[in-house]
Amino acid sequence: MYAEVVWSTFDRLPLVAPEARASVETGLIALCRRLDVEPVAVKVSATRARLVLRFKPAHSIGAVVTALKLGSQDAAVVAGRPIRWAPGFACLSLSVTEVRRRALRLRARH
């Protein structure tokens, strides 16, 4: 299953500093691979994280996203800027054709 997953910072404040974004993205990609989830596209902005992911049938999306949020907070602390994510997340299932379109658009942003 392909899905776009999005979560925001606490109160949508710009808590992800520009110099920490690449580190957080790299950390999210590595964590996805450890969780056996395919990261198709990953983008972190000042106020949110947006990922296009390929899940396996046995995955619990909620458990994966919880692990990703916690792991990305750790990556940001290592980069020197703590992040506080807001509770919850949005998830939208994607068709195979929509995956390509969203991944390209996500990579072109910011």
Predicted regions and their residues:
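Charge-rich, low-complexity N-terminal segments
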Residues: 1-110
